[in-house]
A protein has these predicted regions:
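Catalytic cores of DNA base-excision repair glycosylases
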Residues: 1-169
Length: 170
């Protein structure tokens, strides 16, 4: 996302400018991120909702999730980045880190798991919650990988349930 942000903001400096964009206008900026057609539609709906709301980004999860295309993860990201709320960016990567360290989740779908949400909130609710979120996501990508995690390089493996089970069988 960082690699297209500046070009995107230069091309579409306001919600109004974005409402006038066609999928063809958005394609070169969104294609490198994948799923550009889906994202183009979502961006268009969000831009129209923002213009209709006077340009203010909603500050509540309920208001944000009323916009078609904005779900739990995106609303949490907006609340965290735009409004400074201490929200966890709970995706499959963060869920993997939390599950491995603390223990298995209680529900199949991470979006509906109160245990996982409580853990995520506990971990990221700090004065520097944005940095904590990014650190966990980076950690998931670099150390606590989905396949072949680098447990020996993990700074917290001594207390990690996944590590203990993998290395002791308990």
């Amino acid at each position: 996302m960082a690699r297209v942000y500046d070009a995107f903001m230069e091309r579409f400096p306001s919600w109004s400018a974005l409402t006038e964009a066609t999928p063809t206008d958005l394609r070169p900026l969104l294609e490198p991120l994948g799923l550009w057609q889906v994202r183009a539609g979502i961006l268009s709906r969000v831009a129209h909702a923002m213009v209709a709301g006077g340009g203010a980004v909603p500050a509540s999860r309920l208001e944000l999730e009323h916009i078609k295309g904005i779900g739990q993860y995106t609303s949490a990201a907006i609340l965290l980045v735009v409004h400074g709320h201490d929200e966890p960016l709970l995706d499959a990567n963060m869920a993997r880190v939390l599950e491995r360290y603390f223990g298995l989740r209680t529900h199949f779908d991470i979006r509906d798991d109160p245990y996982l949400h409580a853990l995520a909130c506990h971990v990221v609710r700090r004065p520097n919650s944005l940095e904590v979120n990014w650190a966990i996501l980076d950690f998931a990508a670099l150390i606590c990988k989905a396949k072949r995690p680098l447990c020996e390089q993990c700074p917290v493996h001594a207390k990690c349930k996944f590590f203990k089970k993998a290395h002791t069988g308990h």
